[in-house]
Amino acid sequence: MSQIDKMAKIKKLREISDAPFVDCKKALENSDYDIDLAINWLNKNGKSKALKKSDRIAAEGLVLAKKDANSVLVFELNSETDFVAKNQNFINLQQKIGELLLASDFANLDDALLIQDEAGRSISELLILATATIGEKITLRRVFKTKYSLEQSVEVYTHSNGQIAVITILKGGNLEIAKNISMHVAALNPQYILKVEVPNEKLQEIQLEVEKKAFAEVKNFEKKPENVRVGILKGMIDKQLSEFVLELQPLATDSAVTVEKYLAQNSATLEKVVRFEVGEGIQKQNVDFSAEVNQQIQEFQKK
């Protein structure tokens, strides 16, 4: 490898890791000038400013849903604070990653992180570079992507604040119907899509609850014909299930019909709904800012 090529590698590694020139040179020399191996070397030796942030919790950020003529995807890009998530550099990174993901095939998140841009930088490298540049841990937490056919109606919805994104795939129907379902799911966040998805244990629990309520609150319930009692119980059970089952919920854009009826009226069937919300499932860190500032002052005084 020529000296010019070596210097180019050092420059690239410095951009990615924000580590000093000497450390980048040493890392590459110890890694046969392989960038990925050099990044690992810096990480193991604690030389990368960006990689030192790897143990921090990134629970803020943005989600985005995108589609083209063949594929649809939704992904979550995280930062440590919502302030950084509003930074134009972060937004530009999100858009770039979205374009790369949509244009590439990958099996899982690990594969997605290996996708390269036009300059030969992987998404993983872009994240490390952003971490070094912005000063917070930046991560691609999760991504869902699938292909679809002409027989399907597919629409995406990303809420204006970038905190919620939904994709809806229907068999039949049209884009307007798929869009309405996406907006409904974004707003109400149903736990289940179909009634049949609700676990039997939960259904039995609800049934017992509803039966007790019917005997206590419905006048002369025990004297009514069996078919009437069954109808009353079904209505009460469905009402309770509608709190968390999509198909039983009144449509957000037209409460006169349930989602199930709305789809049936438009010859559409739900095939897939995916909803991402920023930070869901992440245990956020409680930061004592006073203690953090004092610690930084003490570290500064030691220098």
UniProtKB/Swiss-Prot annotation:
Location of the protein in the cell: Cytoplasm
SUPFAM superfamilies named in the record: Elongation factor Ts (EF-Ts), dimerisation domain (SSF54713), UBA-like (SSF46934)
Function according to Swiss-Prot or TrEMBL: Associates with the EF-Tu.GDP complex and induces the exchange of GDP to GTP. It remains bound to the aminoacyl-tRNA.EF-Tu.GTP complex up to the GTP hydrolysis stage on the ribosome.
Protein family per UniProt: Belongs to the EF-Ts family.
Assigned keywords, A-Z: Cytoplasm, Elongation factor, Protein biosynthesis
InterPro entries membership: EF-Ts_dimer_sf, Transl_elong_EFTs/EF1B, Transl_elong_EFTs/EF1B_dimer, Transl_elong_Ts_CS, UBA-like_sf
Pfam families in the record: EF_TS (PF00889)
GO CC, any one term: cytoplasm
GO function terms (MF aspect): translation elongation factor activity
Protein name: Elongation factor Ts
Domain of life: Bacteria
Residue ranges of the region described as Involved in Mg(2+) ion dislocation from EF-Tu: 81-84
Source species of the chain: Mesomycoplasma hyopneumoniae (strain 7448) (Mycoplasma hyopneumoniae)
Predominant localisation class: cytoplasm
Residue ranges that the Swiss-Prot or TrEMBL entry lists as coiled coil: none
